[in-house]
Amino acid sequence: MTAVSTTATTVLQATQSDVLQEIQSNFLLNSSIWVNIALAGVVILLFVAMGRDLESPRAKLIWVATMLVPLVSISSYAGLASGLTVGFLQMPPGHALAGQEVLSPWGRYLTWTFSTPMILLALGLLADTDIASLFTAITMDIGMCVTGLAAALITSSHLLRWVFYGISCAFFVAVLYVLLVQWPADAEAAGTSEIFGTLKILTVVLWLGYPILWALGSEGVALLSVGVTSWGYSGLDILAKYVFAFLLLRWVAANEGTVSGSGMGIGSGGAAPADD
């Protein structure tokens, strides 16, 4: 019992300097973080230029939501690079790495918790959906990210890690339902169905990669190393966030008349106002 307590204490007492040294000694992990920081910086400047001439309120809201994606990402990845949001976890019995200290870049979940709702907000605004549907998508998304974080941080039970993973996936299914079933009809009515369809497929396909990486990486069955998993997440972030946001903002800037023409449907699903 004493040995177990001592080991647990040692893990908890790892300093940020220890974590930073471990990050910097892992080329794959370190490079996956800094490449994302550099790209986020470039994307922020690009998006500022792309959105500077937007005038309609709805187009501006989409632009703000889009801008927040790289802004959140660069902040969160800076936390990873500094070791602030990275730690060592001792995997529980039953895990493939049971008893070993595993580096956990848990700060990624902060990125997703704050950036993915902005992606959904931008998509909802593009589709001119109603506020109830938008609220559902965003809250289910936050639930997905928070329970995913719980699955990654639990060290007391291997089973409970997978239980929370399953709960996170259930939240994800709710998000997929909104994206694939509810919002396409709203986008059709708003006249944005073509670009919405492209971004919807891009989002769904790429977001499916995250739970797969979790399951295959050190947090799951440990078939992939921490560095390889980190590059997988970074690659998905680049495509699902920066490429997605660029395509959306470019379309909005070129079709602002369509965006402003369908009005601010949030809260009404784009429905026309009732006669007096």
Swiss-Prot record:
- Output the Gene Ontology cellular-component terms: plasma membrane
Which residues are trimmed away as propeptide when the chain matures? 1-21
Membrane association type:
Multi-pass membrane protein
**InterPro entries per UniProt:** Arc/bac/fun_rhodopsins, Rhodopsin_retinal_BS
BP terms from Gene Ontology: phototransduction
What SMART domains does the annotation carry?
Answer: Bac_rhodopsin
Which parts of the sequence lie on the Cytoplasmic side of the lipid bilayer? 52-57, 128-130, 181-192, 255-276
Alphabetical list of Gene3D superfamilies matching this protein: Rhodopsin 7-helix transmembrane proteins
Q: Does the keyword DNA repair apply?
A: no
Q: Which residues carry this modification: N6-(retinylidene)lysine?
A: K241
- Alphabetized PROSITE patterns for the sequence: BACTERIAL_OPSIN_1, BACTERIAL_OPSIN_RET
Q: Where in the cell is it found?
A: Cell membrane
Q: Which residues cross the membrane?
A: 26-51, 58-81, 106-127, 131-154, 158-180, 193-216, 226-254
A molecular-function term among this protein's GO annotations: monoatomic ion channel activity
UniProt topological domain (Extracellular) ranges? 22-25, 82-105, 155-157, 217-225
Q: Which Pfam families match?
A: Bac_rhodopsin
Q: Which UniProt keywords apply?
A: Cell membrane, Chromophore, Ion transport, Membrane, Photoreceptor protein, Receptor, Retinal protein, Sensory transduction, Transmembrane, Transmembrane helix, Transport
Family statement:
Belongs to the archaeal/bacterial/fungal opsin family.
Function statement? Light-driven anion pump.
In Swiss-Prot or TrEMBL terms, this protein is called Halorhodopsin
Q: Which organism is it from?
A: Halobacterium halobium (strain shark)
